[in-house]
Amino acid sequence: MRAAIVFVCLLLGAGCDESSPVGPTVGLNERFTLAPAEVAVIRDAGLRVEFVDVSSDSRCPAGVLCIQAGDAVVRIRVIEGNASTFYDLHTGDSNRAAIVHGSVRIALAELQPYPFSTGTIAPGEYRATFTASRV
């Protein structure tokens, strides 16, 4: 019996990256929000999506008059089986706010918090909201 329990534990943990906290399990067409390094499981698609980080954030701060709205770049990692692919999603360009991985479209819906001119955003404070849908 003990061997069976150990086997099940190993089987369940085999597909997990121990360095990334597991986040929500969501279905297609559901919005989900992740913190940096958090991973969502997309059931019905066989994918996991990790919010890696915000590699740059030049969005115009709230309360400031800017010529351009700016852009933030959200790096994600899509994990399918043992393979993973990195992508950059942009807040300031609707043509680059989504990617297609196989038959699944992953779109960045929102990045919070929005910058203010009076402070900086610590990397761990970011929360990115995504959707995943069939192409």
Language model: regions and residue ranges:
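Positively charged n-region of N-terminal signal peptides that target proteins for export
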Residues: M1-A4
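Surface-exposed, beta-sheet-biased, low-hydrophobicity segments with strongly acidic/polar composition
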Residues: D17-V135
